[in-house]
């Protein structure tokens, strides 16, 4: 069985790739360059994780997105919310809009679908999850359902996108990742990279962007030792 894993190098996609590995899929990973500030670190993480999982990694250039994106992920204008803001819907929605890249997931998953069909893979594994689905419309079960509906008409082999984390929040994802590492006797999570910024030291996170703050909270609430290095703890 073949599968494509959309692997940004972040915690969610790293754990999703572990899920695919645990289900005995022959994995190929794809990582996208959409002109994001953290590109270099994401590629390093994705390639390291792919190596550990014995998977080929392909970096796909969709840098044209940067030409029309006003996202902080492209411009470097990264919001830094307070801890208490993470569960405030209005403030989280504002932060979401500041980092929203136009149609990013639609573009990435469409390309991944073509890749999957081309190598006769039956599934695309994505790291879409419950916590991000609260504010990001392209992380919701409705998005997954309707995207798969389009694949019924857009691909001959009717490849399907799956999101094994779609019912999980970040602490649950961290916990699942640790369980899968123990089950598979692999070490992946410490090489994942969630930060919105491109810090000079490999795998070093800023600790102040929303993604870093959610990562910190995930390990803390899961009761798991956080292997991440942060500039600001």
From Swiss-Prot:
It catalyses: 7-carboxy-7-deazaguanine + NH4(+) + ATP = 7-cyano-7-deazaguanine + ADP + phosphate + H2O + H(+). Binds 1 zinc ion per subunit. Zn(2+) binds at residues 195, 206, 209, 212. Its cofactor is Zn(2+). The keyword Protein biosynthesis does not apply. InterPro entries: QueC, Rossmann-like_a/b/a_fold. Its EC number is 6.3.4.20. One of its GO terms (molecular function) is ATP binding. Coiled coil: none annotated. It comes from the Archaea. ATP binds at residues 7-17. PANTHER family: 7-CYANO-7-DEAZAGUANINE SYNTHASE. Belongs to the QueC family. This is 7-cyano-7-deazaguanine synthase. The gene is queC.
């Amino acid at each position: 069985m073949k599968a494509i894993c959309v692997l940004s190098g972040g915690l969610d996609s790293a754990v999703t790739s572990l899920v695919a590995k645990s289900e005995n899929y022959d994995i190929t990973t794809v990582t996208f360059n959409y002109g994001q500030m953290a590109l270099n670190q994401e590629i390093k993480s994705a390639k390291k994780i792919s190596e550990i999982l014995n998977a080929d990694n392909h970096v796909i250039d969709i840098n044209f997105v940067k030409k029309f994106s006003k996202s902080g992920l492209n411009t470097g204008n990264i919001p830094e919310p307070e801890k208490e803001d993470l569960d405030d819907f209005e403030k989280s929605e504002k932060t979401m809009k500041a980092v929203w890249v136009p149609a990013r997931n639609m573009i990435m998953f469409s390309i991944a679908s073509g890749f999957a069909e081309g190598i006769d893979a039956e599934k695309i594994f994505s790291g879409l999850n419950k916590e991000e689905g609260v504010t990001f419309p392209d992380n919701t079960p409705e998005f997954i359902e309707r995207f798969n509906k389009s694949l019924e008409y857009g691909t001959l082999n009717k490849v399907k996108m799956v999101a094994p984390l779609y019912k999980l929040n970040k602490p649950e994802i961290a916990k699942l990742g640790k369980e899968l590492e123990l089950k598979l006797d692999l070490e992946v999570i410490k090489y994942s990279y969630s930060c919105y910024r491109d810090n000079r030291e490999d795998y070093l996170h800023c600790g102040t962007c929303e993604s870093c703050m959610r990562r910190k909270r995930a390990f803390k609430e899961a009761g798991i030792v956080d292997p991440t290095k942060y500039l600001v703890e």
